[in-house]
């Protein structure tokens, strides 16, 4: 993979300078440049406009641009920092930074909280947790009965909802996640230290490869 100069970034689509992105994240300049190659691949898979649309994001994650999944939607929404329906290169790098092994645990916990807080109320409610558990199980090809899913939700609230008000606030979530590190197992991608051309999927062991694009 060849190096990409700042001039090439500007010519491409006024993308942010990799040196600036490296200063703001745990990535090195060379890692940011490698991520740019990956970003180009994904952002030109369908619309070819230098921005990642939801369909392209889903194709990269699930190899299916038409698949509807709450989990994929939530990840896309959290990556779309400007909330304009697309992901630009700066958003791509800053969002992937959450999954870097050297990113502080507190930031990973906060991201996971926002992931489950579907309606953006500042709390995780039972219905939100139930919906997310179903979505994650669906993508993991795990089939559980409704009763089993309810038990997962019940146990989570029993342990996390310390003041028993029927919702989990950020402090309760932080305490719960700290005691249950398995919750964040998908929040660290070791191979982000050694960037490759495979999309670092935190849902499935899949990627976007040359043959498919």
UniProtKB/Swiss-Prot annotation:
Record GO cellular component, one term: plasma membrane
Domain named EF-hand: residues: 31-66, 67-102, 104-139, 148-183
Record-level Gene Ontology MF annotations: calcium ion binding; kinase binding
CDD domains (UniProt xref): EFh
UniProt-listed Pfam families: EF-hand_7, EF-hand_8
Biological-process GO terms, alphabetical: calcium-mediated signaling
UniProt xrefs under SUPFAM superfamilies: EF-hand
Source domain of life: Eukaryota
Tissue: Expressed in roots and shoots.
Induction per the UniProt record: By salt, drought and cold stresses, and abscisic acid (ABA).
Site entry: Involved in dimerization: 140
Residues holding Ca(2+): 161, 163, 165, 167, 172
Family in the record: Belongs to the calcineurin regulatory subunit family.
Function: Acts as a calcium sensor. CBL proteins interact with CIPK serine-threonine protein kinases. Binding of a CBL protein to the regulatory NAF domain of a CIPK protein lead to the activation of the kinase in a calcium-dependent manner.
Name this protein carries in UniProt: Calcineurin B-like protein 7
Source organism of the structure: Oryza sativa subsp. japonica
């Amino acid at each position: 993979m060849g190096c990409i100069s700042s001039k090439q970034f500007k010519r491409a689509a006024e993308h942010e300078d990799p040196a600036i992105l490296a200063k703001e994240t745990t990535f090195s300049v060379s890692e940011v440049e490698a991520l740019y190659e990956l970003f180009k691949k994904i952002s030109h898979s369908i619309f070819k406009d230098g921005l990642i649309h939801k369909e392209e994001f889903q194709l990269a994650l699930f190899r299916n641009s038409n698949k509807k999944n709450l989990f994929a939607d939530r990840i896309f929404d959290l990556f779309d920092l400007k909330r304009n329906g697309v992901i630009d290169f700066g958003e791509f790098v800053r969002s992937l930074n959450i999954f870097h092994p050297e990113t502080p645990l507190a930031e990973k916990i906060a991201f996971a909280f926002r992931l489950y807080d579907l309606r953006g109320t500042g709390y995780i409610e039972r219905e939100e947790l139930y919906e997310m558990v179903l979505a994650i199980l669906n993508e993991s090809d795990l089939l559980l009965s409704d009763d089993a899913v309810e038990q997962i939700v019940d146990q989570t609230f029993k342990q996390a909802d310390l003041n028993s008000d029927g919702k989990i606030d950020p402090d309760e979530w932080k305490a719960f996640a700290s005691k249950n590190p398995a919750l964040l197992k998908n929040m660290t991608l070791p191979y982000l230290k050694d960037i490759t051309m495979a999309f670092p999927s935190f849902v499935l062991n899949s990627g976007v490869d040359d043959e498919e694009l």
